[in-house]
């Protein structure tokens, strides 16, 4: 599972402010193969981690391109999965390489949403010329995607802004870190946000998670109900912070688990300027 917090301010009042601040955790089985975030060999405009699971190779959960296209995915918690459904990671990868705008792309996805297990998809076009646009679609919610107003949002494994306790708790920590970061250099803000993503305090009880996940989630509820998930074979493997400033400078920092060892981590940062 995953969790995402983001603050969207397309016209920041200060040159030192950010058009987008995003902090996200990817939770996955430790044995599932993946590549750490880097620019794609086949397309050096796109930066993301990559799923390397057999049959799902090339999918991703979060990425951004130098053209200003950004997408992020979470699974929708459901007790049973359709093993014949299409891989959800392709939804992010296809948008990052497409020429479609975010709303048009999500409208296309909404027509095919029944082919996938439950998911939530954020798609954004970041352009100083045309204005930043962020859209959302979840295939377990409304039939049409929505354009998001500027503001701060939280998304986990239910629909956007569903008030799971861990989402509300994490969103408050995120807001506090962003507020403190107004007076801090970029690296310090990134460190504050990574600390938020590392919080493993279980937010219990949470009957909403239990009701949605039923028998699938009950055995791991005490671990799952935290921003940072820590189970023996499953949990938070990657934490990502993306900052986009008023001038279109992007800072993409990823903290990723080395192998299957939750005591060993590596942090890398990529920086570039948006083309538009």
Swiss-Prot record:
Subcellular locations according to the entry: Cytoplasm; Mitochondrion; Golgi apparatus
Keyword terms of this UniProt record: Cytoplasm, Golgi apparatus, Mitochondrion
Entry protein name: Transport and Golgi organization protein 2 homolog
UniProt keyword Cytoplasm present: yes
GO biological process, any: protein secretion
Organism, scientific name: Bos taurus
One Pfam family, short name: TANGO2
InterPro entries found in the cross-reference section: TANGO2 (IPR008551)
Recorded family membership: Belongs to the Tango2 family.
UniProt keyword annotation of DNA repair present: no
GO cellular component entries: cytoplasm; cytosol; Golgi apparatus; mitochondrion
Domain of life: Eukaryota
Job of this protein: May be involved in lipid homeostasis.
Major localization class: cytoplasm
């Amino acid at each position: 599972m995953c969790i995402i917090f983001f603050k969207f301010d397309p016209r920041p009042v200060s040159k030192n402010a950010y058009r987008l601040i995003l902090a996200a955790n990817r939770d996955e089985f430790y044995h599932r193969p993946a590549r750490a975030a880097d620019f794609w060999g086949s397309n050096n405009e796109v930066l993301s981690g990559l799923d390397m699971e057999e049959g799902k190779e090339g999918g991703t959960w979060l990425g951004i391109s130098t053209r200003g296209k950004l997408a992020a995915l979470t699974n929708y918690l459901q007790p049973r999965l359709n093993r014949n459904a299409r891989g959800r990671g392709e939804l992010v990868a296809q948008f990052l390489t497409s020429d479609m705008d975010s709303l048009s792309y999500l409208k296309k996805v909404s027509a095919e949403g029944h082919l996938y297990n439950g998911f939530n998809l954020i798609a954004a076009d970041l352009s100083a010329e045309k204005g930043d646009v962020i859209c959302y679609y979840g295939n377990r919610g409304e039939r049409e995607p929505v354009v998001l107003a500027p503001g701060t949002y939280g998304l986990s494994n239910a629909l956007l802004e569903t008030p799971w306790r861990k989402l509300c708790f994490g969103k408050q920590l995120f807001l506090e870190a962003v507020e403190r970061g107004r007076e801090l250099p970029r690296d310090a803000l990134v460190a504050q946000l990574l600390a938020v993503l590392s919080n493993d305090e279980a937010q219990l009880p949470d009957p909403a998670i239990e009701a949605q996940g039923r028998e699938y989630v009950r055995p791991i509820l005490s671990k799952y109900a935290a921003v940072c998930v820590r189970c023996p074979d499953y949990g938070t493997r990657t934490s990502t912070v993306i900052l986009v400033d008023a001038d279109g400078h992007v800072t993409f920092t990823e903290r990723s688990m080395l192998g299957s060892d939750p005591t060993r981590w590596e942090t890398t940062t990529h920086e570039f300027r948006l083309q538009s």
